């Protein structure tokens, strides 16, 4: 009997699981096991909302898997033996596999700058976001530093400022927030942040995080009652330790079909994968993660049928950014994620962003119910492909 094991139930891992669940249901020659530390699904697209004190729905992975033949195992993966084809859990259980889907994702890089791990908050989980929310309520007034001008930093700063108008929210960034957008969308983004009272300071480097603020490279100290670290991510060292070929950031290098180039029985999806397209490497987002999960699952099904796996091709569509609950900016993009001349802002953008944030769970349900959905087309290089 073939045993397919998926480690990690983020956006990409859940997509692979849901796709496989429908395709192998009722088969007595295939087992599918999903391993994840928590039974609760982490909506990373909404963690900035949780950080500001909003309650999120508690989506349960076992509920999603109900009615399928997928086995859910709760536990932390602490070791991988790629040659023996086994994964080890924190309770010393060992699970063997014939095919592995590696979907361990990424977390905030708290090791690159001194003090981050000790004194900064992160958005790695709903629990982490809840800790920051409690601290913001405790502060009452004061300054909150959000480090990082990417999508997570922008959305977090906006959400905190809207929910806590008594706080002075400072967004510190090496680059201009919204630098990936076109000039009109970027100007609209900055106007939205200014309306909420967010102070932007770009072109700065944080060299140390302290209990009461952050130190910049030029010697300035920015006082803060709380610091949210939203710049830079790192992947699990498990892959490198197991001997899988990885790039300089520790991501597993894949072939065109999303298999590890060093271990063809390992498919890699989401943030943990170094997937190359014609325009360069795919960067880790939910937008690209779900397609990698669906495609890897489809290729596994093809291999079960004795067919060759297909090449993965993908192009980006948009950069959706919420600015609190009442404003948003959507930058539409070319397939390589560069900004097009089209963007959306205001209430229609709010509705668009909410649809994007809510779509993964619905997508998993549809993948579980409708086999044909796994053959959806992903945008690529000005065209579409299966």
Q: Could you describe each region identified by the protein language model?
A:
Residues 1-71, 155-183, 228:
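Beta1-alpha1 glycine-rich phosphate/pyrophosphate-binding loop at the start
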Residues 1-13, 37-55, 103, 118-153, ...:
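Conserved N-terminal glycine/acidic-rich loop preference
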Residues 1-3, 69-143, 228:
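FAD-binding core/adjacent interface of flavoenzyme oxidoreductases
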Residues 7, 35, 95-108, 214, ...:
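Short hydrophobic core segments
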Residues 17, 287-314:
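Internal hydrophobic alpha-helix adjacent to the cofactor/substrate pocket in enzyme cavities
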Residues 118-140, 221-226, 230-291, 298:
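FAD-site-proximal beta/loop scaffold in flavoenzymes
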Residues 325-386:
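C-terminal auxiliary extensions adjacent to catalytic cores
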């Amino acid at each position: 009997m073939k045993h397919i094991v998926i480690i990690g139930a983020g956006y990409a891992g859940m997509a692979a699981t849901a796709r496989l669940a429908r395709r192998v249901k009722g088969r007595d020659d295939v087992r599918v096991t999903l391993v994840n530390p928590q039974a609760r699904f982490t909506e990373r697209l909404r963690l900035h909302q949780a950080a500001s004190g909003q309650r999120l729905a508690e989506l349960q992975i076992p509920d999603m898997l109900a009615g399928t033949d997928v086995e859910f195992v709760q536990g932390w993966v602490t070791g991988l033996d790629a040659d023996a084809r086994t994964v080890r859990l924190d309770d010393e259980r060992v699970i063997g596999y014939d095919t592995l889907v590696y979907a361990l994702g990424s977390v905030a890089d708290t090791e690159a700058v001194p003090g981050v791990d000790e004194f900064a908050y992160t958005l790695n989980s709903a629990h982490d976001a809840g800790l920051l929310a409690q601290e913001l309520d405790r502060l009452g007034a004061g300054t909150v530093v959000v480090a990082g001008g990417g999508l997570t930093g922008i959305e977090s700063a906006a959400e905190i400022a809207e929910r806590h108008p008594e706080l002075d929210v400072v967004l510190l960034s090496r680059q201009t927030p919204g630098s990936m957008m076109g000039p009109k969308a970027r100007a609209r983004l900055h106007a939205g942040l200014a309306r909420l009272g967010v102070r932007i300071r770009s072109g700065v480097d944080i060299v140390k995080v302290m209990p009461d603020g952050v130190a910049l490279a030029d010697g300035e100290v920015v006082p803060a009652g709380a610091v949210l670290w939203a710049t830079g991510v790192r992947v699990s060292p498990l892959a490198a330790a197991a001997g899988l070929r990885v790039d300089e950031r520790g991501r597993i290098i894949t072939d065109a079909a999303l298999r590890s180039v060093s271990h063809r029985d390992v498919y890699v999806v989401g943030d943990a994968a170094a997937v190359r397209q014609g325009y360069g490497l795919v960067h880790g987002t939910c937008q690209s993660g779900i397609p990698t999960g669906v495609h890897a699952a489809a290729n596994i099904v093809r291999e079960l049928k004795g067919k060759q796996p297909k090449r993965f091709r993908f192009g980006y569509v948009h950069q959706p950014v919420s600015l609190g609950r009442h404003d948003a900016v959507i930058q539409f993009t070319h397939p390589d994620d560069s900004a097009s001349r089209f963007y959306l802002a205001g209430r229609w953008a709010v509705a668009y962003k909410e649809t994007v944030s809510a779509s993964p769970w619905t997508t998993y349900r549809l993948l579980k119910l409708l086999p044909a959905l796994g053959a959806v087309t992903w945008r690529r290089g000005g065209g579409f492909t299966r």
